[in-house]
Every structure is written in C-alpha cells, then in structure tokens.
C-alpha cells in the first residue's frame, strides 16, 4: 500500500498557518474530499469542531472546498468528536468531518473524516483523497454548487443519545462529580448529562475562549481536577480531552485512574452482568497489569498497534465489543463506533452504582506495573529510531529488564515526537532505563 503523505493515524494534523493546516490547503482538501466522496454517492456532509479559535476559519474554507465539488455541508458548531460519528449515522449523511487536534494545544488543529457507518474512513479513501490533492481544482457549475445549513439541536440529540446508554433503573443521586472539560467540546454537554442523571456536578475547564483548550487542564494535566476532587470531597473526578473522545478519572482520594483501569472496570462489570462478548482489545501501550488482571477473570486480551482506528479494526475482526488505549480512548461498540469519553465515564459510574463501591475500590483488583513514558520533540527530519546509538540503548535496557518488562519506542502518528515507554516490576529501574533511552534519542535527533 502506498505511503500516505498527509494523513496520519488520526486524520491530518499540524500547526495552524504551517502546511498542511493552511486556508489554501484546507480549501483544496475540501474539494479533493468532495470529489472522492461524491464518487461514492455523497451529497451531505456533517461538519463539527472543538473550541479552537482557528476552527471558524477552517470550517469556512473546508465548506468552500466541498461546495466547489458539489457537496453540501451541515454545521453543528462546537461538539464532541463522537457526536459527529453518531450524527453521521442518524442523519443519514454520507460522511462526517471533525475539525480538531484532540489533546494538542490551541495553535494546532486538524481534520478527520468519518464514514457513513460512523467509523474512521479507511486507508483506501484517504489515499484517494491524497491523489485528488495533486490535481487542479476545477469548480462545478454554479447550479451544482453545494449549500450550507446548520443543526440547531445537535447537542440535544447527542445528550439524549448518551443518556440512553445509561440504565433507567439506576440514578446518580447522592454522587458528587467534578468534571474537567478541558475548555473543549464537552464544556456544555458533559455537565448537563451528569446533572440530568442525578449527580451533583462541579464543572471546571468550561470557559473556552478559543485559546485555552487543553491548557493546564483536561486529560493532559489533571492536577487541578485532583485538587478540586479533594477540596470538594467529591466521589469522583472526570477529565476529558479537547474533543471529548478520551477520558481519564480521579478517585475520591485524588489518585489517577487511567484507560487501562477504566477498561478493566467496564469489562468486569459487563462480565458480571453476563453482557461481555469475547474479550478486550488493547494496544502495545496497554499495561501488562491489565492483561494479567483480565486473565485472572478469564477474559481474553489481545494487543494491536497504537491508535484507536487499529483498536476498532481488531474489534470488528474479532467481533469483540470492548477496546481501549491507556490514554483514555475507550471504544464500546454496543454504544458508539469511536472513542467516547462521556459514554465511557457513564459506564464506570454505572459500575460504581451497581456494585455500591467507590472508584478506588473498583480498581483494587488490577495491579498496574510501573510504567514510564517520555515524549521527545524532534527538531529535524532525521529518524533517530535507525540510529545505532538508540538501537544499542534499547538492547542494553532489554538485557537489564531480563524478560521482566517491556520496551516500546515509536514515532507518534499525530505529533512530531518520539515516544519512549519502559515497563517493568521495579519503578526505579523503569525510570532509569526510560531516561537512558530518551537521552540516546535526544543525542541522535
């Protein structure tokens, strides 16, 4: 398969103003996507975005490109990414587009596409779009230009959908929940859903100004959430990322609960209810503790490449209904076709109520191995992963771990960084080896 030039593991992403996230490129991208999607019978595209200031500009030029190819666009305004997956299906649109850079800073943005089934578009469609990008933009005749419309009740539709995944027989009455919406797409929706289900909600990170998305808040920085949970004597804290497709939790003692622990809680609860189909899909980054804890329950576990699209592909291949990344992307195919932070949070809250247990106690049966993750920003186009220095450092680290741990070093599919992950039984050893490899990467980049 031909290597893609622009599309990464989660669409196209970059710094606004730098290629490819420029008005000129996004206009051409809209036209190219329109040409490809039109060949598949498309005539209506749903477009959503998060709260970045650049979203308004990119939304306009993206629509102009689509319209020039003869496709009409339906705008939702700021809304979580999983809402677009849901709306694309329910409104019978031929595709959905989200303008977002997920957990990245405000100065980044991106474009990702959803198919008519509400899943990420396949590689073949992305390659077809890239092929059109190399051609001259030719506008359709005036009578065939695409139009624009808006969905005024998009948020209400998604709120009703999320609430519908929560059993009517239980309530969140008596639970105090602190939510950190990262000044992003969930800032109105998540607090309202929790309140309507009976919880007492304390909301932070809900004052987006276009430039504070993910800034010292949300899944990338849970310190404020931890502090507020303790200060409010809350039962639980929930942090979303900028576009709402991932979620991290904090228990009543202020301890972080990551994606591995979250998926363990959900899988065990489904098993206890007799609703678990197959097993759980994780990634190469999933903690060994998750695998061993699921094994003790008799729940199968398999790993796939890092990226929620690969998790979903493996779920569809096996017929399993639960998959997740430890970063907090949780896919529950019984409810939605992509990672959905709000729905994943509701499933954990449901487990708390069903078992009459705190989040802290629900995590007691999963013992995570010490894991150290270091991100190294690349300053050149040279790939340090082929460096003999880095290769040697990895071999030394593997010998030190002596088959009692794992090393994973890879280039991010969404950012220009190298991720170094070391996992083992001894926390000090894990930290030392991760720093050792990271230093080798820095010296080689």
Curated annotation (Swiss-Prot):
Q: How is the cofactor bound?
A: Binds 1 Mg(2+) ion per subunit.
Provide the binding site for Mg(2+).
102, 241, 243, 245
What Pfam families does this protein's entry cite?
PGM_PMM_I (PF02878), PGM_PMM_II (PF02879), PGM_PMM_III (PF02880), PGM_PMM_IV (PF00408)
Sites of Phosphoserine modification? 102
What does the record give as cofactor?
A: Mg(2+)
Q: How is it modified after translation?
A: Activated by phosphorylation.
Q: What class of enzyme is it?
A: isomerase
Protein name, please? Phosphoglucosamine mutase
């Amino acid at each position: 398969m031909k290597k893609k030039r622009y599309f990464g593991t989660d669409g196209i992403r970059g710094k606004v103003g730098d290629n490819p996230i420029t008005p000129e490129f996004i206009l051409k991208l809209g036209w190219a996507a329109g040409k490809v999607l039109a060949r598949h019978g498309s005539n209506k595209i749903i477009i959503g975005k998060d709260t970045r200031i650049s979203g308004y500009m990119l939304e306009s030029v993206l629509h102009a490109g689509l319209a020039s190819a003869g496709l009409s666009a339906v705008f939702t305004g700021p809304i979580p990414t999983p809402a677009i997956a849901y709306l694309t299906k329910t409104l019978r649109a031929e595709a959905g587009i989200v303008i977002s850079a997920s957990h990245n800073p405000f100065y980044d943005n991106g474009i990702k596409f959803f198919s008519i089934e509400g899943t990420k578009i396949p590689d073949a469609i992305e390659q077809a779009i890239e092929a059109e990008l190399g051609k001259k933009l030719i506008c359709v005749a005036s009578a065939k230009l695409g139009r624009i419309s808006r969905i005024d009740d998009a948020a209400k539709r998604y709120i009703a959908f999320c609430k519908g995944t929560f059993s009517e027989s239980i309530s969140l009455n008596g639970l105090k929940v602190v939510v950190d919406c990262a000044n992003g797409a969930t800032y109105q929706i998540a607090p309202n859903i929790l309140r309507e289900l009976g919880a007492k909600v304390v909301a932070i990170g809900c004052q987006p100004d276009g430039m504070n998305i993910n800034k010292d808040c949300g899944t990338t920085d849970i310190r404020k959430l931890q502090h507020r949970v303790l200060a409010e004597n809350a039962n639980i804290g929930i942090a979303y990322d900028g576009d709402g497709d991932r979620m991290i939790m904090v228990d009543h003692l202020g301890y972080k609960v990551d994606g591995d622990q979250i998926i363990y809680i959900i899988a065990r609860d489904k098993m206890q209810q007799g609703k678990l189909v197959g097993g759980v899909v994780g990634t190469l980054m999933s903690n060994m503790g998750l695998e061993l804890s699921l094994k003790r329950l008799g729940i199968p576990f398999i790993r796939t490449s890092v990226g929620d699209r690969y998790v979903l592909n493996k779920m569809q291949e096996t017929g399993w209904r639960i998959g997740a990344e430890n970063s907090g992307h949780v896919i529950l195919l019984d409810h939605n076709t992509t990672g959905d932070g709000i729905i994943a949070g509701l499933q954990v809250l449901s487990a708390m109520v069903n078992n009459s247990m705190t989040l802290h106690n629900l995590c007691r049966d999963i013992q995570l191995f010490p894991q150290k993750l270091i991100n190294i920003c690349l300053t050149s186009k040279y790939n340090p992963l082929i460096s003999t220095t880095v290769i040697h450092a990895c071999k030394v680290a593997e010998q030190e771990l002596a088959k009692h741990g794992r090393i994973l070093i890879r280039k991010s599919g969404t950012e220009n960084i190298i991720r170094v992950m070391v996992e083992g039984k001894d926390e000090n050893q894990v930290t030392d080896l991760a720093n050792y490899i990271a230093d080798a990467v820095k010296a080689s980049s």
